[in-house]
């Protein structure tokens, strides 16, 4: 069983800058409070094949996550797939679109899939993610605009 959530937001910064901000996974804790720590391999610029390893806290439980970048087209999109075998895993991405006035539309989406016992939990996870999606988009906007000064 699986389900998807998504959010769209307009950021008052140029698409190239927003793409670079989102591609640097070290920024994830700025807008995703569930991310406790994150590392990248190899170091350097994010590219196809880059792996991000993170510790996240969901429903009071800490788990390790490992995501591989499987699609990367600056400044248009980023795609990832989770390689870790947790009860609920994610794959998704960002779509970015340049807007007039040096602004950017960002769409984030994730498909969550349950494995084993996670098949019983994925509905709750998707419901919570959908409920939080608009706020998640606003957190991305606020973090990117605060980090990327005009």
Region spans (language model):
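Short, solvent-exposed aromatic-acidic interface loops
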Residues: 83-88, 109-115
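Hydrophobic ligand-binding cavity/cleft-lining segments
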Residues: 1-42, 150
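A short, structured loop/turn motif at beta-sheet edges
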Residues: 15-16, 43-46, 70-75, 95-105
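A conserved amphipathic terminal alpha-helix motif
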Residues: 105, 111-150
């Amino acid at each position: 069983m699986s389900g998807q959530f998504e959010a769209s937001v307009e950021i008052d910064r140029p698409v190239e800058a927003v793409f670079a901000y989102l591609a640097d996974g070290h920024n994830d804790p700025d807008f995703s409070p569930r991310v406790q720590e994150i590392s990248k391999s190899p170091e350097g610029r994010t590219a196809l094949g880059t792996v991000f390893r993170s510790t996240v806290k969901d429903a009071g439980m800490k788990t390790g996550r490992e995501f591989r970048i499987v699609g990367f087209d600056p400044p248009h999109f980023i795609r990832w797939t989770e390689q870790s075998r947790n009860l609920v895993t994610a794959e998704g991405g960002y779509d970015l679109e340049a807007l007039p006035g040096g602004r950017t539309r960002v769409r984030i989406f994730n498909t969550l899939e349950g494995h084993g016992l996670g098949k019983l939990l994925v509905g709750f996870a998707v419901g919570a993610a959908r409920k939080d999606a608009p706020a998640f988009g606003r957190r991305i906007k606020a973090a990117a605009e605060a980090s990327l000064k005009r």
